């Protein structure tokens, strides 16, 4: 079976985007892993499937990590999604309603080509994240082997654990991130974020993503970090979130309000691959 796809990225967080509306798609976890493999397949952080909506949305949006596991949400992917459906003539709407496992998100294509996404209302209740804790708190102490780390925990449709660090370049993202990702207090695993506060409207961020490892950028991670910082009184909206590859801009007006994320979405190339595995 030949599979048509488009390679895209949002600040280097890269995706294989597949139109499953106009071509029949049935991919096994093994096929997903092979497609995402940077040596044996196309290579990406996540695979995005565009499907027909089941409800009153315009499209259904499915996200698979490089390990083949399906996840609830991906902010950078949502921006690439709306860019794809516009570029391929699948809609002419500036504002698109997209079904995800975590609910409906509403990306909007801006006049300058950037994409703004209503990422929904963040969740702080440990049961909803999910995170094992007796009650909601601004920060929690997490035991890692012989030490404790202070985290904020929030769901942006997927779970995040955010730490504040003084030196982002030397933060233990690659060594500590995998430990936090699989910590027993996060039943569905977690994305581990490390943020350095530059000023009340600017942070630098690195994220070790659940099922993908450290990525060059993470949209839901940017939202979670900004929200956690605002909750703790460290930040004020709007927040510029800087990754090594560029910036996202996050707006959040407080409790029970949606988070808005603005950033780029870039198409790299179109391709076709024979699925012989």
Curated annotation (Swiss-Prot):
Q: What is its EC number?
A: 5.1.1.7
- What does the entry list under GO cellular component? cytosol
Give the PROSITE patterns listed for this entry. Answer: DAP_EPIMERASE
Which InterPro entries does this chain map to?
DAP_epimerase_AS (IPR018510), DAP_epimerase_DapF (IPR001653)
Describe which pathway this protein belongs to, using the record's wording: Amino-acid biosynthesis; L-lysine biosynthesis via DAP pathway; DL-2,6-diaminopimelate from LL-2,6-diaminopimelate: step 1/1
UniProt xrefs under SUPFAM superfamilies: Diaminopimelate epimerase-like (SSF54506)
Q: Which reaction does it catalyse?
A: (2S,6S)-2,6-diaminopimelate = meso-2,6-diaminopimelate
State if Metal-binding is listed as a keyword: no
The terms under GO molecular function for this entry are: diaminopimelate epimerase activity
Question: Any idea what job this protein has?
Answer: Catalyzes the stereoinversion of LL-2,6-diaminopimelate (L,L-DAP) to meso-diaminopimelate (meso-DAP), a precursor of L-lysine and an essential component of the bacterial peptidoglycan.
The family assignment reads: Belongs to the diaminopimelate epimerase family.
Q: What is this protein called?
A: Diaminopimelate epimerase
Source species:
Nitrosospira multiformis (strain ATCC 25196 / NCIMB 11849 / C 71)
């Amino acid at each position: 079976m030949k599979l048509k796809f488009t390679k895209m990225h949002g600040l280097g967080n890269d995706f294989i985007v597949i139109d499953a509306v106009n071509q029949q798609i049935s991919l096994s976890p093994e096929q997903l892993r092979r497609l995402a493999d940077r040596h044996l397949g196309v290579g990406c952080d996540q695979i995005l499937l565009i499907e027909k909506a089941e409800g009153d949305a315009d499209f259904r949006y499915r996200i698979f990590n490089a390990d083949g596991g399906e996840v609830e949400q991906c902010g950078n992917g949502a921006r690439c999604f709306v860019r794809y459906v516009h570029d391929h003539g699948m809609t002419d709407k500036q504002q698109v309603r997209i079904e995800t496992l975590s609910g409906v998100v509403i990306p909007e294509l801006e006049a300058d080509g950037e994409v703004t996404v209503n990422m929904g209302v963040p969740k702080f209740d440990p049961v909803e994240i999910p995170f094992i804790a007796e009650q909601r708190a601004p920060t929690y102490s997490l035991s890692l082997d012989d030490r404790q780390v202070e985290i904020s925990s929030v769901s942006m449709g997927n779970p995040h654990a955010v730490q504040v660090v003084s030196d982002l370049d030397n933060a233990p993202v690659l060594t500590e991130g995998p430990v936090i990702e699989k910590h027993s207090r996060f039943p569905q695993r977690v994305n581990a974020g490390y943020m350095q506060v530059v000023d009340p409207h600017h942070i630098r961020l690195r994220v070790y993503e659940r099922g993908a490892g450290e990525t060059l950028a993470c949209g839901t991670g940017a939202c979670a970090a900004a929200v956690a910082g605002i909750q703790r009184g460290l930040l004020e909206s709007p927040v510029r979130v800087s990754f090594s590859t560029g910036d996202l801009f996050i707006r959040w007006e407080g409790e029970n309000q949606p988070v808005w994320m603005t950033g780029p979405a870039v198409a790299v190339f179109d391709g076709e691959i024979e699925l012989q595995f």
